[in-house]
């Protein structure tokens, strides 16, 4: 059952080949048997999942099932879940039980998808390797001595190991696409404003975007249909008519114009990754696409600009965790200042503190113009680069990450090297564009991800371009050894 895609599981439920209860039990057994070596789940909600599965079966019997009713899934532990612990990977929220559901969680509940549990993640979504989590690092199912990527590393590892058919992720600078690449699955970061951020714990509000992670592009399209849509409770949510993201899956690629940014194929790109991406480009040519070089001259500034904008927003967003109303509180504070200082000092991990410090500095009176304002100007230039490129091409293609999964502990002492693992993904967030990563082969036995970037609200086309590639390759069908 776990080898099937969501589309196949949905068909099996419709034909009565299995029930949602059987499916949910199967995945819960896999989590129990196999997650010990991965640490991809923070919380497993077995009782709740089985109750939801039973309700889904009853709903199907009444003829009221939607496309995903009864197909189990997992939520990244950044989405608030009513009555279920929501930690955001931090000691600060280790005992926090959310009093409400995030919009994304509500939508999956309304569709009738049993929630298997909450997946591990980098603390407050800050990290590229899932090593900053208070719950310990997640391991990559392809090689447990290596990282799964981050911050949605738990979601990526769980989907890759087939412990869940799908999981939600969030992407602020690559946190869906980079772990999807390192774990050999498909992940979609929608256009900024497509998916409601209500109830999604904020890191950098102008960059954060939730999205689906699954084995295939078709699965991601089905999940995006559930996740996306206007939400009046999120002031950044975009009001647009509902769209069917599966509508263009079978569109032929003849005449599709693909742009290859020269900045994504230069120094720093691992040879094995470059080879796999080149082979994928050849495959696209065979499918009828036209390929040409494009320029994104300011994309090299994306990492420094991001590491001013994102920490600035995080320092503001994380000011709410002060030990007063909820979250971690230090013992026996002497006075209010001591309560603030010690609660935050003891509750936050090193990377989160680093970003709060950088962000507070960038926003301080003497430095605001030199750092924050300048970073926002660069952000505009990056968006303009993409706009010019999309006048010439329909889709931009390149590697998702400069290398395959690196070893646990290899980059933890060097933040800048760690930050550079998102060098190809960050520009997409700064511009607010949709992007996705799909499996495109292996280098030394480790998965390589291919990144596809689209114009605003062009997710349906992106998903179609990915699906056409997946219809002639089988990389998305590969399962790591020991998890078959």
Swiss-Prot record:
Taxonomy, superkingdom: Bacteria
Top EC class, one word: ligase
Molecular function GO terms recorded: ATP binding; glutaminyl-tRNA synthase (glutamine-hydrolyzing) activity
PROSITE patterns in the cross-refs: AMIDASES
GO biological process, any: translation
Annotated active site: 76, 151, 175
InterPro entries per UniProt: Amidase, Amidase_CS, Amidase_dom, AS_sf, GatA
SUPFAM superfamilies registered for this protein in UniProt: Amidase signature (AS) enzymes
Subunit details: Heterotrimer of A, B and C subunits.
Family the UniProt entry places it in: Belongs to the amidase family. GatA subfamily.
Function comment: Allows the formation of correctly charged Gln-tRNA(Gln) through the transamidation of misacylated Glu-tRNA(Gln) in organisms which lack glutaminyl-tRNA synthetase. The reaction takes place in the presence of glutamine and ATP through an activated gamma-phospho-Glu-tRNA(Gln).
Protein's UniProt name: Glutamyl-tRNA(Gln) amidotransferase subunit A
The organism of origin for this protein: Thioalkalivibrio sulfidiphilus (strain HL-EbGR7)
